Amino acid sequence: FDDIDLDIVHHTGDKDISIGSHSNNGFVSKVIRYKGLAAHAAGAPHLGVNALNAASLGLSALAYQRETFRDDDHVRIHPIITKGGNLVNVVPDEVVIETLVRAANKDAIADAAAKTDRAFKAGAIAVGASCEVTTMPGYLPALSEKADASVLTAAEIAAQTSEKDYQIVQEDTHAYSGGSTDVGDVQHLQPVLTFNTGGKVSGLHSVDFDIVDEELAYVVTAKIFALSAYRLLR
């Protein structure tokens, strides 16, 4: 980014055309690996150490942290079990959980991450298993941004040259999303101008997601990119 002055970014949205952006959470990513001891699940369960039980207790402990998170910090923690055991008749000796820990600011991310580690390790201690937590960097919180005049004008021209009547709105900078984006990292380095276009049905990452207006999703979007660049460079 050393030779770049600013960036223009786009994402699929719910409105026809929206200019500007609201805030988003940042996050860190974690992999939690429980190690127990295999044994016959029916014949000799007392000889094993159940890593799945440790993980279940860890998930429960994490749930009890919920009341400690401030509403203003928009904390979101959503783990999944990616490995729960190998065979149904064997006490699980390895269980793996992956989770993202999201929040609105760096201090809140650090606080929620520490509570997450503590909760999962507590599950291991309870049943005599071991627990290894690996934390990886994610994204910084995204910043709200008012609609830029050049991008707004570009959107107006792109809409006027379309056969359909597309509505243009300016994004509510006081709104908030619990999701995260790598745009947050870039915003902490240099200016970022944002616009969204619709043309889809159903929610993102859902089985029913589909593009139903290709002109808006592709053509109008490309026009806004090109016209914005032209107006900013001229």
Q: Can you annotate each of these PLM segments?
A:
Residues 1-78, 83-90:
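Histidine/acidic-residue-rich, glycine-tolerant segments that coordinate divalent metal ions
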